[in-house]
């Protein structure tokens, strides 16, 4: 099956210009199904929140590889924009404004990011004589809240249209 033109490749997936104003994020072969489902469910949980983001439409299976269909967002990455313009201050302003708009939307129906971090810490120490105890204790001391944590917020993951 033709997935369309490749428009990006990352650590976990390749993104294709799919059809009808949508892109396909096709996860690399062997990427865990539960991780794909978690990404889809987390994205769907954002549907009613007031900040710009692509909408997810569903999980697809293409020749044994799982993918998620998203809205196609046109624009350039903030990384490319800042390299083109040299406007570091403008980049910081765009990122701060977007980050504020994300934080202005409390969210309650997604998994705890603290629990996610603790789980990853435990996995990273598996088979080691060291223990993640100190770090997990610090995480436990952080307050719980309803703020959304993107987890991968950087200029390469932000698309802009003519400087906005």
Label for each model-derived stretch:
Residues 9-36:
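ATP-binding glycine-rich loop module of kinase domains
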Residues 33-49:
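The N-lobe alphaC helix and its flanking beta3-alphaC-beta4 segment of protein kinase-like domains
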Residues 27, 60, 73:
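Residues forming the ATP-binding cleft of Hanks-type serine/threonine protein kinase domains
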Residues 79-113, 132, 138:
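Conserved kinase catalytic-core helix
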Residues 1-5:
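Conserved N-terminal boundary motif of the eukaryotic protein kinase catalytic domain
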Residues 104-151, 156, 161-162:
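An alpha-helical support segment within catalytic cores of ATP-dependent transferases
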Residues 55-66:
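Short beta-strand micro-motifs within the conserved protein kinase catalytic domain, predominantly
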Residues 64-77:
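Conserved short submotifs of the Hanks-type protein kinase catalytic core
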